[in-house]
Regions:
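C-terminal motif of bacterial Sec signal peptides marking the signal peptidase cleavage site
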Residues: 19-22
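Bacterial signal peptide processing site
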Residues: 24-26
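Active-site recognition of the HExxH zinc-binding catalytic motif
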Residues: 45, 139-156, 180-181
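Acidic helix-start/capping segments at beta-turn-to-alpha-helix junctions
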Residues: 55-74, 163-167, 198-207
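Short pre-active-site segment immediately N-terminal to the catalytic Zn-binding motif
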Residues: 126-141, 171-172
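Post-HExxH zinc-binding segment in Zn-dependent metallohydrolases
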Residues: 151-157, 161-209
Length: 242
């Protein structure tokens, strides 16, 4: 898969899970939006991952319009346009997408549907979309804070800038997303891996993630190759990390 597309699809992690948090609330010690959610998640993430935040994570809100601008911007530089045009041509030649499908606007709409929040390694800020349901915002914060912690030890920005080596980029993205998904699930289960490790437990969680994705209209209408490209780093990455 193309470098630029994989980089943008990495932003969609918050839309992958709808499990209910069993974590106990803690006294907030952070300021700004979602201070209570951040204060609750940080110590659990540090315990699960085994690393401490070097600096407090930053979190801000973004309007849906700002998210659309951000997503659109990822496709507008000359290299991105060239990559997407080539990928679209290859998909059509192989019969993987309809001849009438325009990949760039479709991906923009798909990502808008998926994104509840994202961590930007360039600004070092976790962004949550205004008006997001509370449960989804909590899941987003937990997942993306894992990325914020990863970024304090390994530069995620440098990984996202990998060029001309899609296999390397895909492997790195799957490791980062896989850890975030797996630790998020563990935290949602109260810090226990019992349900994950029970016979059939992990398979059921994978099914739940796929079912949730399929409930989203644009994702459900997407060609199979786009669906699998979107979901691969999360499911297969978590399987590897497990």
């Amino acid at each position: 898969m193309i470098v630029q597309l994989r980089r943008v699809l990495a932003l969609a992690g918050a839309g992958l899970l709808t499990l209910v948090s069993a974590c106990e609330s803690q006294k907030p010690k952070y300021e700004g939006p979602y201070a209570a959610e951040v204060a609750q998640a940080v110590p659990m993430i540090e315990k699960a991952v085994g690393l401490k935040f070097k600096t407090p994570p930053k979190i801000e809100t973004r309007s849906k319009e700002q998210v659309r601008e951000f997503v659109t911007k990822q496709f507008t530089d000359s290299l991105a346009k060239h990559d997407i045009a080539g990928q679209e041509a290859a998909y059509k030649r192989l019969g993987m997408i309809p001849d009438t499908l325009k990949l760039q606007p479709f991906l923009t709409s798909l990502l808008e549907e998926q994104i509840v929040g994202y961590y930007d390694p360039h600004t070092k800020v976790l962004y949550v979309v205004d008006g997001s349901p509370k449960d989804m915002a909590q899941l987003t914060i937990t997942h993306e804070l894992v990325h914020a912690l990863q970024d304090q030890y390994i530069s995620l920005d440098s990984v996202q800038k990998i060029r001309d080596d899609n296999d390397r980029l895909s492997a790195a993205q799957s490791v980062f997303e896989g850890q975030a998904v797996y630790e998020q699930i563990s935290i949602m289960l109260g810090g226990s891996n019992i349900a994950i490790n029970l016979p059939g437990g992990w398979d059921r969680i994978r099914e739940m993630i796929r079912e949730n994705q399929s409930s989203m209209p644009i994702f459900a209408a997407a060609p199979k190759v786009i669906q699998e490209t979107l979901i691969f780093p999360y499911l297969s990455g978590a399987e590897f990390y497990r």
